[in-house]
Curated annotation (Swiss-Prot):
Gene Ontology process terms (BP): aerobic respiration; electron transport coupled proton transport
Annotated gene: nuoB2
Lipid bilayer topology: Peripheral membrane protein
Described purpose of this protein according to its UniProt entry: NDH-1 shuttles electrons from NADH, via FMN and iron-sulfur (Fe-S) centers, to quinones in the respiratory chain. The immediate electron acceptor for the enzyme in this species is believed to be a menaquinone. Couples the redox reaction to proton translocation (for every two electrons transferred, four hydrogen ions are translocated across the cytoplasmic membrane), and thus conserves the redox energy in a proton gradient.
Parts forming coiled coils: none
Cofactor: binding details: Binds 1 [4Fe-4S] cluster.
Enzyme class: translocase
One GO molecular-function entry: iron ion binding
Cofactor(s) required, per the database record: [4Fe-4S] cluster
Residues given in the record as [4Fe-4S] cluster binding sites: C63, C64, C129, C159
Record key words, sorted: 4Fe-4S, Cell membrane, Iron, Iron-sulfur, Membrane, Metal-binding, NAD, Quinone, Translocase, Transport
This protein's record includes keyword Metal-binding: yes
The protein's name in its UniProt record: NADH-quinone oxidoreductase subunit B 2
Length: 235
């Protein structure tokens, strides 16, 4: 009886776990068209400075403005979050907080003050009246939300909201600032295009008009009108 070599069983190797998906961190693009020229540490520093140095312009219109004052005092103290209250005016402010009922008569003033703020600028709608009209939504003289006049970044609900709600809204705004790109937010993008989507939605920037095809000038003389006859001249 001949000896034959028995096949050796394949060595059992533990199944390798599937490769984990790489964690993709958001690239800090916050310098618009200059983002490709600035070093990465500089982008982080500039973004950090924008998040934690928000000068606030409070546009108080009703009782929600009292809650804003309470949030800025020592008990809640939103200065510890990097928010500086009571800017001298809209030209020195980064953040406008609209608190209270916006009437149709006040709407042009809200829009004008928003236009005076320098870029980058942000808006928090504070309270039900500013969000959608609140208890006075069915009034003939009340604007149904300040977002019909200017773009809003964060909505804080409540009638009136507590100061803690405003602190939460400020944190949400800082999170939004951390992941946004100035090239996408403002008028000119990195591709050199026209106004951004936010700028067009705000109604403050006119949409660019595409140049249409122009008709070629004709060099051939057109048909001339016949000379009037003597009968037509008498008439």
């Amino acid at each position: 009886m001949g000896l034959t070599s028995r096949p050796t069983p394949a060595s059992r190797q533990p199944a390798s776990p599937p490769p984990a998906d790489p964690v993709l961190l958001p690239e800090p693009k916050r310098l618009g068209v200059l983002s490709r020229l600035a070093p990465e540490p500089m982008k982080v520093v500039l973004n950090w400075g924008r998040r934690y140095s928000l000068w606030v312009f409070n546009f108080g219109l009703a009782c929600c403005a009292i809650e804003f004052i309470a949030a800025s005092m020592a008990r809640h103290d939103f200065i510890r979050l990097g928010v500086i209250p009571f800017a001298p005016g809209p030209r020195q402010a980064d953040l406008m907080i609209v608190s209270g009922t916006v009437t149709d008569k006040m709407a042009p003033a809200v829009k004008r003050l928003y236009e005076q703020m320098p870029e980058p600028k942000y808006v928090i709608s504070f309270g039900a009246c500013s969000n959608c009209g609140g208890p006075y939504w069915d009034s003939y003289s009340v604007t149904k939300g300040v977002d019909q006049i200017i773009p809003v970044d964060v909505y804080v609900p409540g009638c009136p909201p507590r100061p803690e709600a405003l602190l939460q809204g400020i944190l949400k705004l800082q999170e939004k600032i951390a992941r946004e790109s100035l090239a996408e937010r403002y008028a000119t993008g990195a591709t050199g295009g026209g106004p951004s989507t936010d700028a067009l939605r705000s109604g403050l920037v006119a949409a660019p008009t595409a140049p249409g095809p122009t008709a070629p000038a004709s060099t051939a003389p057109g048909p001339t009108a016949p000379a009037p006859t003597q009968d037509e001249e008498r008439r």
